[in-house]
Amino acid sequence: MQKHTGYIVPNKIIKTIIPVFVFLITFSEIHTQEQPVLKDIFKNYFLIGAALNEAQVSGEDTLCAQIVKKHFNTITSENALKWEFIHPKPDMYNFEPADRFVEFGEKNNMVIMGHTLVWHAQTPRWVFENENGKPVDRETLLNRMKDHIQTVVSHYKRRIKGWDVVNEALNEDGTLRQSPWMKIIGEDYLVKAFEYAHNADPDAELYYNDYSLENIPKRDGAIALIKKLQSQGIEIAGVGLQGHYKMDWPTAAQLDSTIKDFAALGVKVMITELDIDVLPYKDISAEVTLKVEMKGKIDPYKGGLPDSAQAALADRYKDLFETLVKNKDNVKRVTFWGITDKNSWLNNWPVPGRSNYPLLFDRNGNPKPAFDAIIGIVKNN
């Protein structure tokens, strides 16, 4: 009789090994599955977008470009369409960067947004001054505004879906900001800007865009402004809440009431520049020269965001997106101001050189817990 040299595994051990083996295979499959895509997750709710810079559009920043192509279905240009970039001199229009931005969106079947036509910032001084450096008269400034709006909007007619026609025209108390536009033309500069934009592209959607509209005084000012525009026959399609939020502001209730108040005017609401600042802010921008110990207090996460802060940010995004999802009939678009934490403007404002973590993707382009938190809202629904 031949001697058996094999090893017999007891049946009880086999019964234990098989379930563990199956679990490991299943666990591996789950974590190698395709990452959820934001634009697909929110397709029945609102457009989901990002603001792009030149490096991302040109392909120099391939990491961010790939994230944009995968996750977003609408784009806004950070700077290419602002006056100082596209119309830097009286007789000079520079369309090349903006053309690349629009072509990027068209190539990737994205809804393209124009930001911005009339703003007090990032507008060259020559717009408001004559050759002697003195303020121009009303008619001269109106003509310059008209030429700029008609030239830029016509150049992208039926290619750019909607425009932030006027940006940040209000003070915190809801009164009109005393910008050069206001001082030289008067408050009807807003009506004129919308009229010029509509005439240049009757099919384009026209928006008013501002920050801190979640605060009641400023919101009331915006409501009065929109009503005035509507009373003069302006077809304003929506209002943009910039969405540069803090960890404790606005509350979900403030955001909810803001959306409802604007929806009552018959306009859609868009979150146009969303990010959440995780760093200390109050009383720091006035200090020009920061001491080393002060720098540490206002830049506490230089080495990375701790798990506790990461979880708090995820909860914050979850609360905000629950409110947006609940108001999906009135919220048309949510656009993040940037793509990864690495390229966020908040790394250099209000204090240069800090490490901030305001977006859904980390510095290496990986989704953060905040990403999982917001997609979980829809999946759970």
Each language-model region and where it sits:
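Short, acidic/polar
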Residues: Q56-H71, R144-V152, K218-L229, Y317-T323
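Bacterial Sec-dependent N-terminal signal peptides
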Residues: M1-Q35
